[in-house]
């Protein structure tokens, strides 16, 4: 069973699923943030728009792609999967590479859609002591969401 799972994870199809899922999530998070900024100056409304878009796209890509690759979509999720011996070191490194490429592709896509420079630094200054706390919480939320969905078999019935 473990050999079968490893073979499935090492397939081209699994790698494409990780690339595509990560790209879609990145494009949605970045693009919905850009769209929200265009819609309103109200920061609370911007965060709400971004959060709603992120939640729905995350549910969708987990539902669609978990059966193909495991729906890891983030190196932090892979670290947890590796520590739980759900994936091999080889899968960890190969998925990390395709996820990074997918994240870049998603960012480029979002920038292109909103007619911004395809590659460049963020125009939003993000600093302050609470930034690292918010990143840790967001990453922990992503890890929990993916593993709860996968471990409880919800990747197949996220929408009911």
Residue ranges of predicted features:
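Membrane-interface helix-loop junctions and terminal tails of multi-pass membrane proteins
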Residues: 1-160
């Amino acid at each position: 069973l473990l050999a079968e799972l490893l073979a499935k994870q090492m397939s081209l199809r699994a790698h494409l699923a990780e690339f595509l899922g990560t790209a879609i999530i990145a494009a949605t998070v970045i693009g919905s943030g850009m769209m929200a900024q265009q819609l309103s100056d109200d920061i609370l409304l911007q965060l709400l728009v971004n959060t709603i878009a992120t939640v729905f796209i995350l549910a969708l890509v987990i539902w669609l792609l978990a059966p193909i690759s495991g729906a890891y979509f983030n190196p932090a999720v892979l670290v947890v999967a590796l520590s739980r011996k759900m994936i091999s070191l080889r899968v960890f490194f190969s998925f990390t590479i395709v996820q990074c490429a997918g994240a870049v592709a998603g960012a480029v896509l979002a920038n292109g859609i909103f007619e911004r420079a395809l590659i460049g630094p963020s125009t939003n200054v993000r600093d302050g002591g609470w930034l690292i706390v918010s990143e840790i919480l967001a990453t922990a939320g992503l890890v929990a969401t993916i593993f709860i969905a996968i471990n409880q078999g919800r990747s197949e019935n996220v929408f009911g």
